[in-house]
Amino acid sequence: MPSLFERLKSGTERQHREIEALIDPLKNFRSLDAYKAHVLRSWRFYLPLEDCLAAFDWSAAGIDFVPRRKAHLIERDLRALNIHQPGLEEAQPLARQNLDFALGCMYVLEGATLGGRVISRHLATLGIGPENGGLFFHGYGAKTGEMWRTFQLSATGYCVTEDQIGEAVSGAKSTFERFSESMLA
């Protein structure tokens, strides 16, 4: 049986490519205004989703969820970039209310944090760094790789049955779809 992360990767390959095309920094972050629009869309996606994910007992999977939250980093970027934070629509609940599905959601968010390192390097060419509007893409800083590996170990140790892995893949697909919708809004 393929591992959890092999299944997550193969099961979301199409969605992953679509997201990469949507947020390609070389095409989409050519100006400060384009970057600001992306930061605002990211906040509209992350805050409600993280609020839904916060309801789960992550300790069952050996994960401390609180330090993995990113919406507060985006809020700091919004302030640094002088972007007004408009009201948000009420958070839509996850399609399925189980930790396996939520782990699939986290796979997308943690993978985005890992990929943020590439975007962070590009933002430097616009003069944007963690201190002036690029904190979100800075992720966990020097600990980003370590946090990804810790997440992989925890998720793999928790999602061991075929049903659990299937739920995680469904959660990841759902999250990619939500993210695509928010980037196109």
Residue ranges and their predicted role:
Residues 1-185:
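Metal- and O2-centered redox machinery and metal/ROS homeostasis
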